[in-house]
């Protein structure tokens, strides 16, 4: 599996039938792309299961997509039909137009720490109950409780500023967290929009006793050894004037 940002240049197109033989999940960060004459603009999402047929893809003016592949990328251009699990298809969801707060907070164990946010479930896998969802955090409504999960979790900050136990994250920041790693609490001085995914099964949450949250935490990212030097580079927040 892989998580990547894919940039499609203006005029990019594929006008033939093909099948991607792994799950592809994406969220549009910039621009617009059309698949099978369905237009995906900024802040739209899709989950296209393995074997989903694509007859055309085009990006007239270019697009940037946050993309998740469920396995090794394998594209089949043969005329042989491939089946796919229709229960795992999310053809298009617009974050702007969707009905938010469609998440079972009790099942996820997030009720105690979600008072300062609202959630939008984008996809729940019927095979293993992995979930992809958006969290919109309001300004100056920080959580108080550290937490951990029995499954891996990754998230990408789509907008705003998020302050947590490893420092400040802003738009474009990414985190991969293995199972059972204690993290948080988080809060935002500006409001933040975050896309999160659980990997390895259903998301549940263990809550720890309350601690003090800081909106100006020390910058101390946890990184693989080959990225340790990158973690020492400070990134200034955008100026207000």
Predicted regions and their residues:
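Ligand-binding loop in jelly-roll beta-barrel domains
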Residues: 22, 39-40, 50-79, 151, ...
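Hydrophobic alpha-helical segments
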Residues: 211-213
């Amino acid at each position: 599996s892989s998580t990547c940002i894919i940039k499609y240049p203006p005029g990019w197109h594929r006008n033939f039938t093909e099948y991607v033989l792994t799950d592809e999940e994406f969220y549009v960060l910039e621009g617009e792309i059309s698949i099978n004459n369905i237009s995906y603009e900024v802040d739209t999402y899709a989950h296209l299961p393995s074997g989903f047929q694509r007859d055309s893809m085009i990006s007239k003016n270019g697009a940037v997509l946050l993309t998740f592949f469920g396995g090794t990328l394998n594209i089949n251009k043969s005329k042989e039909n491939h089946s796919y699990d229709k229960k795992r298809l999310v053809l298009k969801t617009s974050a702007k137009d969707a009905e938010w707060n469609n998440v079972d907070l009790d099942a996820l164990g997030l009720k105690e720490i979600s008072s300062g946010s609202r959630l939008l479930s984008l996809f729940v896998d019927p095979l293993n109950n992995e979930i992809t969802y958006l969290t919109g955090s309001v300004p100056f409504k920080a959580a108080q409780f550290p937490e951990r999960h029995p499954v891996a979790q990754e998230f990408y900050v789509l907008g705003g500023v998020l302050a947590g136990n490893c420092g400040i994250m802003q738009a474009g920041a990414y985190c991969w967290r293995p199972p059972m790693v204690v993290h948080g609490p988080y809060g935002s001085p500006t409001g933040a929009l975050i896309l999160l995914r659980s990997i390895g099964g259903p998301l549940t949450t263990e809550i720890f006793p309350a601690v003090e949250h800081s909106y100006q935490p020390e910058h101390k990212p946890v990184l693989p050894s080959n990225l340790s030097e990158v973690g020492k580079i400070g990134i200034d927040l955008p100026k207000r004037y």
